[in-house]
Amino acid sequence: MTAPKLHPGAEFLRNVFGSSTEHPVFVCSLLNAEARGTEPVNERPLATRNLGYISRFAEKWDRPGRGLYFCVATVVPGARRRAKETLSELNCLHIDIDFKNVAASPEEARRALAQCPCPPSCTNNSGHGLHCFWLFAEALQATSENIAEVERLLGLLADYLGGDRAAAEVSRLLRLPGSHNSKDGCWVEVVTESNGPLVRYELDALCKWLEAVSAPLIARRPPEKGNGQDSNPWLEVAARYKFKPPIDVEQRLAA
């Protein structure tokens, strides 16, 4: 009897997590920002290593008004939510490049990535940008020390390659290949772009590379000014009193 064909997202997760980790992979479906309130439940989570479960979950929840995501780190067994305190294994460095936020064209960005001394292990086209991954030869336990070191490197990587700084954290959700980006009425498939053989890196090699770079290889566009004012007085007051507004998770998710 022929085994059912796996969803592309399940195949991707097997390649990324299969040989270097042991604990559950976190996958979820989230309502798009513009679709909030149209369904009673926003987040539909799944934490498992069963590829069949992931395939069926992806087929069920890949639909307009929602997005399918996976966490870049594994979670502890039994976890029902994704947060730094529920992470188990750190498996990669990653970057979220939004084409509208960088000065390079999509093809220029791809060429720059390919020319890096340590090119990405794999790259996904998110529909409006690139999600790139530098896989570790061996996963790291998600201790506070390892989290701090990996997030330091994620910050260097984002600065060097024009990535979103908000995505430079170890519990990040990124779009699942084989699903569709349906924001603002679009229906664009998230696809894995071939980078050749899957390369895994020692953390020391990535550290030496990122600590040696200077000027950005992919520059970000300067932020646009809103109404002609140089600053937002409300944000200035918030900064003065060290007030932090609640994080809008969907707004921060990758394009």
Please name every model-derived segment.
Residues 12, 153-156, 209, 237, ...:
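Charge-rich, solvent-exposed alpha-helical interaction surfaces
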Residues 134-138, 177-178, 192:
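Short, structured patches in soluble enzyme cores that scaffold and shape functional sites
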Residues 37-50, 107, 185-200, 248-253:
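Short, polar loop/linker segments at the starts of domains and inter-domain junctions
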Residues 1-130, 136-152, 159-160, 218-221, ...:
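Signature for HUH/AEP ssDNA processing cores
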Residues 155-187, 206-220:
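Flexible helix-coil linker/hinge segments at domain or subdomain boundaries
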Residues 24, 188-235:
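Long, charge-rich alpha-helical interaction segments
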Residues 75, 178, 254-255:
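Short, hydrophobic/amphipathic alpha-helical patches that form generic packing surfaces
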Residues 221-255:
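N-terminal structured subdomain of primase-like DNA metabolism proteins
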